[in-house]
From Swiss-Prot:
HAMAP family: MdoH_OpgH. GO terms for cellular component: plasma membrane. It comes from Shewanella baltica (strain OS185). Its EC number is 2.4.1.-. This is Glucans biosynthesis glucosyltransferase H. Keywords: Cell inner membrane, Cell membrane, Glycosyltransferase, Membrane, Transferase, Transmembrane, Transmembrane helix.
Length: 727
């Protein structure tokens, strides 16, 4: 398709002006983690503007510590009757680590439950005019352009209707490396500009080299354009946000001069597979309990989850520049899970970081299958374990360190749970197969029996299950109490059925995810880097042979654990069966939960329904319609050959190419750049050049005006004698 073949694109000039505004460079220096920078922390503008109430920390963190100490004492008492053996000490230590982890979530859940019982409403700041400027950033990496650009189109249009549109500029920041997707992005941007240029300022930039991934993408924007704006509202490629939420965030930031970052709690939407629906339902029913409780007690020392949050540009650029960690990945190099670190550094500098748990209208999507979840978690696991290098940073608030530690434990907890299961199994096998030493060297009229307090052990088991499932129970109680909420998910009966189904299916998936996380931790400890793979967001289905290969070790582990249990007794096998069944049937579970067809069956039945699915927000409906329209607009994708052939298309493409200098004078030429230069220079026609360029090299050519001009000057015709051979 050429420019003249589409009425929307009948122009050689980019509608709405330049693809990016004029640069206003600003400094964003990497922070020193080994010492506190001069001038930090800043003095708060408002008295007590960044001070939190200690009483809330005492209630939640103190309560979690007391609960953990009680449980650890009880576990010690279970073993202490007959004397504690080394293996029992190991069980006790592993139990202590795991229980502390769930106790904090439980106590946060209690706080969230009590707050949500009162049905809090978002604070009305009554700000009539925004005098600050906010850049809304939509980073994208090899995503479907129809999804990304249609979402921006809808959000920009609805925001313009509020009367506050003048205070916001929109930026799509692409790190795409696929040349086909890069050209589709340009097509979609032309459509977006045509639709929005009369009411919104929308821009597009694709980096030539995606250094430091998403964090580097945003940092590049800040260094070149950040000084133009007071705030940055960071989205993700699957984000949606209502106009009232966008303006509400900007108003809160404007009203609080000490606010450095305000994070929303996004609701999950658009799940089509059973796995996505499961995550949506759990996040909607139980998530607010944990999120609200967390936001309540962390107060000014909140966290950043990488998107759907607004950041003060000054705080971000002066305090959150990320350094490279010494060494190679996975523990060295660029900081992968940048969000937690950026929040900690912003708080270190004296700005507040707040979780806006009372602000609705923020949305995102979730992985469609167990395999897609595993791919994402492998990357997150590496980034979170990398935070072990960040924990000693000078000047961090202790709550910020706790955020980093909980992120680490989100993945280390799986190996700890597995070790606890294995040591418990070893205790059972030891009691069954190893003959006890009835009479010791010390004189006694009575034998020494290996005994433990079974009644206390059973009571502790019930307590542990109560702590583990407590947040779920709180979420269900809130659902049953609120008739309107219950009706929004299909009524109380369907809601209870959905909860039961979610608990059972989650219990089957949990051991699979435990082994997936254990494998991720092991591969990281072995020095393997995760790389950066694009995410699938819609269909999660895979061939059965692929699933068998991906879950082969999980099934084998389930069989081996079951065999070990049955060596002791059928009773032990029955006790372990909730954790083993999921491993035995990992392949069908993975296949069924990743299926759109099965997800559709549950949708029609009203199982695992959410309010956002049954009564979608207007912006979600508009985004769905707009995406279908964008799919039609870019149904005939451009190619590099067409760009070279059509002068008008070439001019439009060059208008969207990043204007940053290709290479600073005197800097070394990268190997791939040199190879591309040779291939282009030695080609005798466009077709022969395109025949020898791989996809990565084509992406580089698309971002290089000099190479494009050189190729454009070549004749199009391909003749045999023009072939160039390379070794």
């Amino acid at each position: 398709m050429t420019v003249s073949e589409n009425s929307v694109l009948e122009t050689e000039v980019l509608v709405g002006g330049s693809a990016m505004p004029n640069e206003r460079p600003g400094a964003m220096e990497p922070q020193n983690l080994s010492k506190m920078p001069e001038g930090f922390p800043r003095r708060s503008t408002v008295a007590n503007g960044v001070r939190s109430r200690a009483s809330r920390r005492f209630l939640v963190v103190g309560g979690a510590l007391l609960l953990s100490l009680f449980a650890i004492y009880e576990m010690g008492a279970v073993f202490s009757i007959g004397g504690i053996t080394p293996l029992e000490y190991l069980v006790l230590a592993l139990f202590a680590v795991n229980f502390c982890w769930i106790a904090l979530a439980f106590c946060s859940g209690i706080a969230g439950f009590l707050i949500l019982l009162r049905k809090p409403r978002a604070k009305d700041l009554q700000v009539t005019e925004l005098h600050t400027r906010t850049a809304i950033l939509m980073p994208t990496y090899n995503e479907s352009p129809d999804r990304v650009f249609s979402a921006v189109s809808v959000m920009a249009e609805t925001l313009s209707q509020t009367g506050h549109g003048h205070a916001f500029d929109w930026f799509i920041l692409s790190d795409t490396t696929d040349p086909d997707i890069a050209l589709l992005e340009e097509q979609a941007f032309l459509v977006l500009r045509q639709e929005t240029h009369k009411h919104s300022r929308v821009y597009y930039r694709r980096r030539r080299k995606n250094v430091a991934r998403k964090a580097g993408n945003v940092a590049d924007f800040c260094r070149r354009w950040g000084s133009r704006y007071d705030h940055l509202l960071v989205l993700d490629a699957d984000s949606l946000m209502e106009s009232s939420t966008i303006t509400g965030l900007a108003q809160r930031m404007q009203a609080d001069p000490d606010a450095g970052l305000i994070q929303t709690i996004p609701s999950l939407i658009n799940g089509t597979t059973l796995m996505a629906r499961l995550q949506q339902f759990a996040a909607r029913i139980y998530g607010p309990v944990i999120g609200t409780g967390l936001g309540w007690w962390v107060q000014k020392e909140g966290n950043f989850w990488g998107h759907n949050a607004i950041i003060r540009t000054e705080a971000f650029m002066t305090a959150a520049g990320l350094p490279n960690l010494k060494g190679k990945p996975p523990f060295g190099g660029h900081i992968m899970s940048h969000d937690f670190v950026e929040a900690a550094l912003i708080r270190r500098a004296g700005w507040s970081v707040v979780i806006a748990y009372d602000l609705p209208g923020s949305y995102e999507e979730c992985p469609p299958s167990i395999i897609d979840l595993a791919v994402r978690d492998r990357r997150w696991c590496q980034g979170n374990l990398q935070h072990s290098r960040i924990l000693p940073t000078k000047g961090l608030h202790w709550v910020s360190r706790l955020h980093l530690l909980t992120g680490i434990m989100a993945y280390l907890s799986s190996p700890f749970w597995l070790m606890l299961i294995l040591t418990g199994l070893m205790l059972a096998l030891q009691a069954h197969f190893i003959r006890p030493e009835y009479f010791t060297d010390q004189f006694s009229l009575f034998p020494t029996w290996p005994i433990m307090d079974s009644d206390r052990a059973l009571r502790l088991f019930y307590i542990t299950m109560g702590v583990l499932f407590g947040p779920k129970v709180f979420g269900v109680l809130l659902l049953l109490k609120d008739g309107e909420f219950a009706r929004s998910v299909g009524g109380r009966i369907k809601a209870i059925f959905s909860v039961i189904f979610e608990v059972i299916l989650s219990a089957l998936i949990a051991p699979i995810m435990m082994f997936i996380h254990c494998g991720a931790v092991m591969s990281i400890l072995m020095g393997r880097d995760s790389g950066w793979s694009p995410q699938r967001r819609d269909d999660g289905s895979m061939p059965w042979m692929t699933l068998i290969y991906r879950h082969r070790w999980h099934m084998l582990a389930g069989v081996m654990l079951g065999y070990a249990a049955i060596l002791d007794s059928l009773t032990l096998l029955a006790w372990m069966s909730p954790a083993l069944i999921g491993l035995w049937i990992a392949v069908p579970i993975s296949a069924w939960t990743g299926s759109v067809k099965i997800g559709e069956v549950f949708k029609r039945a009203g199982i695992l329904a959410t309010p956002e699915e049954r009564n979608p927000a207007q912006i979600c409906l508009q985004a769905h319609e707009a995406r279908a329209a964008y799919q039609k607009h870019i149904a005939e994708p451009w190619t590099l050959a067409q760009v070279l052939k059509d002068p008008a298309l070439m001019e439009l493409h060059l208008a969207m190419v990043d204007k940053q200098p290709l290479r600073a004078a005197g800097t070394p030429i990268e190997a791939m750049e040199a190879i591309v230069h040779v291939k282009v220079h030695e080609a005798r026609c466009q077709q022969s050049a395109l025949a020898v360029l791989n996809r990565q090299e084509m992406a580089m050519v698309l971002a290089n005006p000099l190479m494009l001009r050189s190729l454009q000057k070549l004749p199009e015709q391909f003749v045999e004698e023009d072939l160039v051979s390379f070794c």
